[in-house]
């Protein structure tokens, strides 16, 4: 039986593509393994998926670009993670390793390279993060959402890999009619999506301006915090959704989102009006700011700095999007930067030598 190892974690964005590819390998009879942090979001997501995946937990550390005593400890954690990964991969003897990035992916990538296992990695952002900069040195091939410098000879530019448009599931979740009964059909609907680590700013904005917002809009707020769950007049707040995600997206006139590339390209593929509020440099390396500027320059989106986000500025930006809806939708419709999961899977299998 052929075997493949997946790795990647730390945020949902470092797991999503793996969970889209894994079922295709399982359907072809592959034995699938996943190396990550047993206490990380990758383990949680793999378990939630219900997929037949063998999960292996390793030590992980975050290498920082600035001096920190924590770095010294984390170097040892990464080293131990490499030793653990060497043992795991040597026992599995896989045909390939696929990495979606995040610091937990560095030890398995290094170990696979040392064991002469082909390593395939994916980079979603405009510029590589530190983890993938390290991983690139050990990779067989890197696939990128955005074009990368020609000097990176192992890179294949594939565009954004998204599942949008690949499902015909039109089943109405049982919660949807109840939600709709609380909404005013004459008002536009705003959907706030903060991702696994960026919802707090949106949550605070809505909590502080709930009455004013719900006078003008139906508000859907994916909070990541179950203590905020609420269904009221023109307001639906929920911590997490699965089968409701696409129906709620379909309801929205405008989506207010962070700047993660996975979410951005899903919105572009759906031709969904959106306002980007990227995570600032105090909370990230600035990749979301770069993604947001890129999307705005392409005419797909509008973006606003987190420090400038207020009730008043939100009204201005949403009004601008709605007034020029045709412009943004047409630009998204003309995008050639989207690739289906099936197309990417076929490319990956071809590069793996089938």
Swiss-Prot record:
One of its GO terms (molecular function) is undecaprenyldiphospho-muramoylpentapeptide beta-N-acetylglucosaminyltransferase activity. The keyword Glycosyltransferase applies. It is found in: Cell membrane. GO terms for biological process: carbohydrate metabolic process; cell division; cell wall organization; lipid glycosylation; peptidoglycan biosynthetic process; regulation of cell shape. Keywords: Cell cycle, Cell division, Cell membrane, Cell shape, Cell wall biogenesis/degradation, Glycosyltransferase, Membrane, Peptidoglycan synthesis, Transferase. Its EC number is 2.4.1.227. It catalyses: Mur2Ac(oyl-L-Ala-gamma-D-Glu-L-Lys-D-Ala-D-Ala)-di-trans,octa-cis-undecaprenyl diphosphate + UDP-N-acetyl-alpha-D-glucosamine = beta-D-GlcNAc-(1->4)-Mur2Ac(oyl-L-Ala-gamma-D-Glu-L-Lys-D-Ala-D-Ala)-di-trans,octa-cis-undecaprenyl diphosphate + UDP + H(+). It comes from the Bacteria. The keyword Cytoplasm does not apply. InterPro entries: GlcNAc_MurG, Glyco_trans_28_C, GlycoTrans_28_N. UDP-N-acetyl-alpha-D-glucosamine binds at residues 196, 288. Pathway: Cell wall biogenesis; peptidoglycan biosynthesis. Belongs to the glycosyltransferase 28 family. MurG subfamily. Cell wall formation. Catalyzes the transfer of a GlcNAc subunit on undecaprenyl-pyrophosphoryl-MurNAc-pentapeptide (lipid intermediate I) to form undecaprenyl-pyrophosphoryl-MurNAc-(pentapeptide)GlcNAc (lipid intermediate II). This is UDP-N-acetylglucosamine--N-acetylmuramyl-(pentapeptide) pyrophosphoryl-undecaprenol N-acetylglucosamine transferase. The lineage of its organism: Bacteria, Bacillati, Bacillota, Bacilli, Lactobacillales. The gene is murG.
């Amino acid at each position: 039986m052929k075997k493949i190892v997946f790795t990647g974690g730390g945020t949902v964005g470092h797991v999503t593509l793996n969970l889209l590819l894994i079922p295709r390998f399982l359907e072809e009879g592959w034995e699938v393994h996943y190396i990550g942090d047993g206490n990380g979001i990758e383990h949680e997501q793999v378990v939630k998926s219900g997929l037949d995946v063998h999960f292996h937990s390793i030590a992980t550390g975050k290498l920082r670009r600035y001096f920190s005593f924590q770095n010294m400890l984390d170097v040892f954690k990464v080293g131990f993670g490499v030793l653990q990964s060497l043992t795991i991969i040597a026992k599995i003897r896989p045909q390939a390793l696929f990495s979606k990035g995040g610091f937990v992916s560095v030890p398995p990538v290094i170990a696979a390279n040392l064991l002469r296992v082909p390593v395939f990695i994916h980079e979603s952002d405009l510029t590589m993060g530190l983890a993938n900069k390290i991983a690139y040195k050990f990779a067989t091939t890197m696939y990128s959402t955005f074009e990368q410098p020609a000097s990176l000879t192992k890179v294949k530019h594939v565009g954004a890999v998204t599942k949008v448009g690949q499902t015909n599931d039109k089943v109405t979740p049982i919660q949807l009619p109840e939600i709709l009964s609380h909404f005013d059909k004459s008002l536009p609907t705003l959907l706030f999506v903060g991702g696994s680590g960026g919802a707090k700013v949106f949550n605070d904005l809505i909590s502080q301006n709930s009455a004013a917002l719900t006078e003008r809009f139906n508000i859907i707020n994916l909070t990541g915090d179950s203590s905020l769950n609420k269904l009221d007049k023109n307001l639906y707040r929920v911590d997490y959704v699965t089968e409701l995600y696409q129906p709620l997206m379909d309801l929205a006139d405008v989506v207010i989102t962070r700047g993660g590339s996975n979410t951005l390209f899903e919105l572009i593929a759906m031709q969904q009006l959106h306002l980007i509020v990227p995570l600032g440099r105090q909370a990230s390396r600035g990749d979301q700011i770069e993604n947001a500027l890129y999307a705005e320059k392409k005419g797909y989106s509008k973006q606003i700095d987190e420090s400038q986000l207020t009730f008043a500025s939100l009204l201005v930006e949403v009004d601008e999007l709605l007034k020029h809806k045709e412009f943004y939708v047409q630009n998204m419709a003309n995008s050639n930067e989207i690739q289906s999961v099936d197309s990417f899977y076929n490319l990956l299998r071809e590069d793996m030598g089938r």
